[in-house]
Amino acid sequence: MAVEEKNSPTGAAMTNTGILVPSSQQSLPEWWTKTQKFFSRENTITPTFGYFRLLFGTQPGKTDIALIVIGTIAGIGAGIPFPLLGILFGELVDDLNSSTCSTTQAPPGGYQAAITTKVLQVIYVSILNFVCMYIHTGCWSMVGERLVRRLRTKYFHSLLRQEIAFTDTLPSGDVTSRLVSDIEVIQAGTSEKVGLFIGTISYFVAAYIVAFLKVATIAAMLMSVVPIYFLMAFGGGHYIKKYSGRISTHINAATSIVSSSLSHMSIVHAFNANARLEALFAQHLVSARMDALKKAITHSIQFGMLYFVAYASNALAFWQGSRMIADLAEGKPSKVSVGAVYTVIFVLLDASFVLSQMAPFMHIFASAASAGDRLMTTIKRQSAIDGTSSEGDSTISLASEEIELQDVTFNYPARPEVPVLQGVSFKIPPNKHTAIVGTSGSGKSTVVALLERLYDPITGCVRVGNRDLKEINVRHLRGSIGLVQQEPNLLDRSILENIAHGLVSSSQEKHKHLLPTLLGPSLSELTEKIRQGASEDEAVTEQGDVVREIVNLTRHAATLSNAIDFINALPDGLATRVGSSGAELSGGQKQRIALARALIRDPPVLLLDEATAALDSTSERLIQAALNKVSENVTTVSIAHRLATAKDADNIIVMQKGRVMEQGTHMDLVARDGVYAGMVRLQNIGKFSSSSSIMTESTQVDANIDRSLTTDTLLNKEEKLSLEQGVLDEKEKPAQLYMPEEADSLPTEPENEKEKPKQTLWATMKGSFPLIRPNILLISLGLITSIMIGVSYTGEAVIFGHTVGSLSVCRGGPSIRSSGMLFGLLFFILAIVKFAAVIVNGAAFGWAAEKTLYRTRVLSLRSLLRQPLEWHNADGRTPGLLVALVTSDASALSSLTGTTIGVLFSTVANLFAGVILSQCHRMEDSRSPSGYLTRIKHQKAYAKATAITVESVDNIKSIAAFSLEQEAYSVFNRSLKAPYKSNMKSVLHGNFWLSLAYSISTLVYALAYWWGSQQILAGMYTQVQFFIVLPALLFSTQSCGQMFALVPDISKARIAASNIVDLLSIKHEGDEEYDKTGSKASAKHTDPRFNMLEDKPRDVEAQLITTTPSSFPTKGMGVQFRNVHFRYPSRPNQPALDDLSINISPGQFCALVGPSGSGKSTTFALLEKFYNPASGSIIIDGVDITKQSGAAFRDTIALVPQENVMFEGTVAFNIGLGARPDVEATQEEIEEACRLANIHDTIAALPDGYNTVCSQDGKQFSGGQRQRLSIARALVRKPRLLLLDESTSALDVESEKHVQDALAKVARKTTIVAIAHRLNTIHRADRIFMIERGRCVDQGTHAELVERCESYRANVIHQSLDA
């Protein structure tokens, strides 16, 4: 249960890192602190220490201490009653034995009274057992829930404070795996199962105590096998932990592939890359599968040995007990009785049985310890640059301070062999504009990262005034800087919250009072109310004056960044959610929001890394004018490839290959005729116009006008420009084109899923059967051995009954000895049989489970990758939830072919065998009710918190740059409250039924004893019959309790199976034809959805050879848009294309230009058939693709997206993804494409060359390098139609020149359509289409449009460098 503390409104205290942590950790007893320190040590000698470190090394609070203590005491108490029952049952045996051996004809009434009294005592003890069990399962369930919540917060806290270098080297998919798989494993291993295990150990110890008190000789003999139990537990745990670590590594990589693929579905579709991604995914799964099999076999051997030792020790006990009873029967001196021997054998037999039933728990605990160690490694890691720390000088002001880099060298940790900066030295004067230009990969963005102290130099230093940057408090430093990144990352919040993030760590004193509101839920609640229909003014008034001040500051910043008009045009205005990383906005919109976020804090230092690269020239010009106005007393550092945006800088620094080549003003550098002058010549668009002198004159006039404009006048001018008004209809969302709409919003259940009726159990089973069918022989073997295991309990009962019956003193000593030896031998044989059965069972089900898991995951990913974008764009259907289908749901389903189904079948076999045995011996008490099972609801809790964590890590540079660690932490904690509260409530009623299920066996046993004893006393049944049925019923009811504990897993698997069957049941275009993700059906009746890759999938990274290299086509494609209308499904009231008509002839180089949001990228989306138009025709090579099924036409189309995407895999694999589906690109073809894209030399210089592994999104490469890799991926396809969406926006002029020359060669036999804001890249186009408001308003050559199109001419003038 949650305990609110008084230290803060959230029940937390502030640490020296500035992050809120639970205040219950304060003022703990000294002994508890010492315990924590002991278990916090990195002692990994045994899994036991790892497990205790998990429990006690995470700073549990007072409530946790109380729950652990109470739960442990109750667990110990729950284990004691049954050995006490053994004493009572032993006395009952003596009473029954005396009765049956008596010569009196009628049963004495005293025996009946004694038996009734003891049965009542049994019932009382059973009630006590239930109470103790309910308490300990409840306490430990809450301990587990609180522990995983604590681990989540600590892990997230640790991730937030780590330096960027750490996250750069973090394995792809690692965070998702930690927060989904590992947390789930930890919760399973630290909840009610701990209480059950403690109760079992208590039972085991108490049983031996009772045994020693009753018959010390037998107890001492059996005590010798106890070390073997622990040896098996710890030895097996060691190997299980070893294999779990290996599995985790492979699964992390596989999960990364799934995540990146589902996040960039348009790229997957554009290149038909699903088969190659699926194959790479399968490779990782195969590697994990072998380790999983070893883990399963290890577990089964561990389990089997525990059974063998338990049964073998019971065989010894039977034999020794029979000898003692024989001595007693022969009148030899003996202090034992039949009841005493029975008590010893009974309690030790049952204790061994229960302990063996706990063997699966050892596997769970070992896995939890292993998962805990993985989390604790990150949690305890000390950050080299802690943005949350209070250390360092927080008083220094960056205003009017000179910034200097002194002989700085640097290389990124992910690629330590590659130098990025080499002896860089330059000064940045205060209150001046310094521009940094140069080739892509020259270190420009790295300089910005060092100024923000996202990294520290390897040698040299960065100084502010006379202070080293390391001496300044990191949070204070970053709070004094406004940053606009090359690829702006926004968090999945509203526009208001994203812009207001700039105020969170502002160094301005006037913003300090806003911090509590910024960290609280007020802005989130405000935007939610607006989205629900409330007016902005009313909602703001309700929230108070501070919120109104934040809203006003936000609007002012949005005005300065030229974003206010498109914001006002959105249905929810400032309350509009931007999606994960701003996926709901276009590239230009995101840049303007990011600029507003930087400007809102009124920073003394402004860092602009390609801040206007995604904007059209008019928008860029307006923003530049606004920046000139607000940066008069600001130190501004800008990085630019468009030299027009840098020419007015006070100082321009030119960099190449990590060195400063030259610096000075624009005029000085042009006069030197050096590197910069060459860049100017390459980029100057003025020379391409016949009206160059006119443009130069116009540029000078406009420059003078711009300097005289106030911000208000500027915005009035903007409203009159038809170009910028096109932004009001900004629906094309270029970022969204390559990322499904609402792609990474926080996981919620899709509306259509909520309304869809659930599948029946039969439909689910029928749909799941094709997944299981290939493993039917393994499953059959597992089921046979499960039945053998289940029936073995009945065999045990038969042997036990005959043994107890044969130990009656009514029989002679020799008979007792021979019977004891016989049944002891039978018990030993049973031990051997069960040992073999358990091993075969574990191996068979383990291998079947892994093969089913492999098949299910690959088929699920296949189905997901084949769904159209509109399916992925459905409301609430997010990559986060879809990844769960491939990972969590597939894993849950596979449990039905693994240990869960094995235990279930052995339990059912045990139950039926016990009932049948009871009926064979005509015991009426077997018809007594044994209780009912209750289904536990399966919950997908914490998905939102996981999504927040993954999003924060993906955007960690933005989080760090704006010191949003505390804000992200606050949002994260708020997301935990609802599922935490819900789960804690479920503990109360869920554990009631669990405790009842485990305790019911004792009551059934008491009832059976009472009824059976009456039958024996009445002379209707024999002792042998009674003692056969009694343990059979006991084992059956105990197995029912264990089966009840499996109900959550079975329920989980049932839901998972339903989800997966639903997914696989979706029909796709071409199911009846060749399945490109697999192979042709082997028979006509075979469902192609279940076609599988080979058991050993092809190595897609190694298989880069083909017998016949492909060649460039001889003819390009013709393209026509005829009266096309289109609206995005998410915004049906706003047109994206409005009667668009264009005609592109085969082999032409055509360009689409126009303002941001005018519909340019939407044309590409329709050309790729990501969507179908509402009306009109799209004709490619004479075929209307809107009326054709399938997308085979994409095989000869290549796309270079605006936002460049890399997948998990080598560089060669990423480029090879672009090859046509039926061709594997050769190494020569890959290198040729890279040379054309001017990236070959960069790749060749890497230590691993083309085998260099790209992390998810290729974050170890610069923006320009990723763009060239994307171009190479498109060129390796050798397309007939090449689509370029701002394909050179991140390139320097030299790289751009190389790429343009390469495209000129390709263009001879290929149709090229380019979207561009840099007009110098398309001035040679055969035809340029001017797109505004979803229509083509003009078309012609560059020269023709300069002459007659005013808006086009204005853009040319702005980009000219002749002035």
From Swiss-Prot:
Residue ranges of domain ABC transporter in the record: 403-682, 1119-1358
Transmembrane segments: 65-85, 119-139, 193-213, 215-235, 301-321, 336-356, 781-801, 820-840, 896-916, 992-1012, 1016-1036
Location of region: Disordered: 738-758
Predominant location category: membrane
Keywords, sorted A to Z: ATP-binding, Cell membrane, Glycoprotein, Membrane, Nucleotide-binding, Repeat, Transmembrane, Transmembrane helix, Transport
Compartments reported by the entry: Cell membrane
UniProt-annotated glycosylation sites, renumbered to this chain: 97, 552, 633, 973
Ranges where the ABC transmembrane type-1 domain occurs: 69-367, 781-1052
Top-level taxonomic group: Eukaryota
GO molecular function annotation: ABC-type oligopeptide transporter activity; ATP binding; ATP hydrolysis activity
Membrane-protein topology: Multi-pass membrane protein
Pfam families xref list: ABC_membrane, ABC_tran
A GO cellular-component term linked to this record: mitochondrial inner membrane
PANTHER family for this protein: ATP-BINDING CASSETTE TRANSPORTER, ATP-DEPENDENT PERMEASE MDL1, MITOCHONDRIAL
Entry similarity comment: Belongs to the ABC transporter superfamily. ABCB family. Multidrug resistance exporter (TC 3.A.1.201) subfamily.
Function: Pleiotropic ABC efflux transporter that may be involved in the modulation susceptibility to a wide range of unrelated cytotoxic compounds.
Descriptive protein name: ABC multidrug transporter MDR2
Species annotation: Trichophyton tonsurans (strain CBS 112818) (Scalp ringworm fungus)
Gene: MDR4
